[in-house]
């Protein structure tokens, strides 16, 4: 398929460059109602994505247009040629400043390791199922579960001579739990992504979700609190820290949507709490986003974004890095945040609201505004813990970063590895 597409590309006179990505995906899928298997299926599919580039000049300035099309392995040569012609035609209407394509390298790439590197993905799905349906003593129950396991063989070829192959892996589960011990039934949806079978990770996720389902069944509506320590946990932590990934991206800097400047402290002066130390890690164990190359075919390496709050580098794909005149890191989606010095127990010495689940945690990558309504939280008033819901918080990261504290304990959520909790002092909690 690759050779056929490239031979047809070379017949087009108006193409200045191209990038072809082919991916062969093998997967196993299982669907359960309670503990009963409802459906079990496997897939083996091939996809191709072709981007063509078309260069032109206006008033002495170089521009590069591009257009991407999907090509199916069932297409005839005539159909593929028509697709290519459509892409070439569309590319002339895209007017981006010129940028280069990735070039070949002799450096050796790492190999992602995974238990999903096997032809027997069904057995891996069974292991995941066993971790989900492990016996637990709880009043909340598992209502249903869906399991998706896949390995993907990727090849990237471009007109500059790049021709690389690598494998990536993805596991994904969706679980619905319910509990009927309160005044009304409670149902909670949870999901998780991973890149290798991990009984510990999956078992902990299910146990925590069952516990939270039971707590939510007994939760009372939150009261208004003018000032209290707020502890953000679970997936919202990853979303909170992702703000810094956005602010240090070359595209945000180029578009003047970022305050980040190389060599300057992003947190400002006189920081009272923990300082930010963030790295991009292309080969993070058990992350489905781990890959030795990005979609441009650029070799990926580890990079430090912030060191004690100081911006060390901007990151991103070739295009915007070229516009800024910085060395491209490539598109790396895994990031690691250094934990703090205090344990979760130490963070909870004073009264606090620990938010476990948001309805929809928002985080504006430009303004730094964050918050949302929470579905479940634990409020410690100094004497006892109250299970609460239907409250909300709002704040701004540019203000919060002057004094926030990270837990010593770490956790991983897909492509995030870092503190399990963040404490932000003196926040207002809206409620009744």
Residue ranges and their predicted role:
Residues 4-7, 16-28, 77-166, 201-238:
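Acidic low-complexity segments
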Residues 9-10, 37-41, 129-136, 159-167, ...:
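A generic local secondary-structure boundary/capping motif
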Residues 16-49, 144-164, 295, 351-372:
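Structured beta-strand/loop patches that form or line metal/cofactor-binding pockets in enzymes
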Residues 26-89:
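N-terminal alpha-helical targeting/anchoring segments
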Residues 31, 126-205, 251-277:
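Extended amphipathic alpha-helical scaffolds
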Residues 46-58, 164-194, 305-307, 374-381:
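Short beta-strand elements
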Residues 57-65, 173-200, 268-269, 311-333:
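Short, acidic (Asp/Glu-rich) active-site segment that either coordinates a divalent metal cofactor
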Residues 265-432:
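Dual-mode signal for accessory low-complexity, basic/Gly-rich regions
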């Amino acid at each position: 398929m690759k050779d056929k597409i490239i031979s047809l590309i070379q017949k087009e006179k108006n193409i200045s460059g191209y990038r072809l990505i082919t991916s062969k995906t093998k997967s196993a899928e299982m669907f359960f109602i309670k503990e009963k298997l409802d459906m079990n299926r496997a897939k083996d599919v091939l996809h191709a994505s072709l981007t063509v580039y078309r260069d032109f000049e206006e008033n002495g300035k170089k521009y590069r247009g591009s257009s991407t099309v999907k090509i199916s392995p069932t297409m005839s040569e005539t159909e593929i040629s028509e697709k290519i012609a459509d892409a070439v035609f569309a590319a002339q209407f895209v007017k981006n400043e010129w940028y280069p394509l990735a070039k070949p390298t002799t450096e050796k790439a790492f190999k992602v390791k995974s238990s999903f590197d096997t032809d027997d993905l069904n057995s891996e799905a069974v292991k995941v199922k066993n971790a989900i349906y492990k016996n637990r003593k709880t009043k909340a129950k598992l209502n249903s579960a869906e399991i998706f396991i896949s390995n993907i063989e990727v090849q990237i070829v471009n007109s500059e001579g790049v021709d690389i192959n690598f494998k990536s892996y993805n596991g994904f589960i969706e679980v619905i739990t319910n509990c009927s011990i309160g005044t009304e039934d409670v149902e909670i949806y949870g999901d998780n992504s991973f890149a290798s079978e991990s009984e510990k990770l999956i078992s902990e996720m299910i146990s925590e979700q069952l516990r939270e389902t039971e707590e939510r069944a007994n939760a009372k509506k939150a009261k208004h609190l003018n000032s209290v320590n707020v502890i953000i946990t679970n997936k919202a932590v990853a979303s909170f820290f992702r703000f810094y990934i956005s602010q240090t991206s070359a595209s945000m800097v180029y578009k003047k949507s970022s305050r980040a400047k190389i060599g300057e402290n992003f947190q400002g002066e006189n920081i009272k709490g923990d300082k930010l130390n963030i790295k991009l890690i292309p080969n993070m164990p058990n992350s489905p986003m781990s890959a030795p190359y990005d979609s441009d075919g650029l070799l990926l390496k580890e990079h430090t974004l912030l060191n004690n709050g100081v911006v060390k580098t901007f990151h991103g794909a070739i295009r915007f890095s070229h516009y800024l005149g910085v060395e491209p890191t490539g598109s790396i989606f895994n990031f690691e945040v250094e934990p703090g010095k205090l344990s979760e127990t130490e963070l909870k010495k004073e009264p606090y609201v620990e938010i476990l689940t948001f309805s929809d945690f928002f985080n504006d990558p430009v303004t730094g505004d964050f918050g949302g309504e929470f579905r479940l939280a634990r409020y410690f008033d100094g004497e006892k813990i109250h299970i609460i819901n239907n409250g909300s918080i709002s704040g701004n990261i540019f203000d919060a970063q002057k004094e926030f504290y990270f837990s010593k304990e770490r956790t991983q959520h897909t492509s995030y590895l870092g503190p399990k909790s963040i404490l932000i002092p003196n926040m207002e909690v809206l409620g009744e």
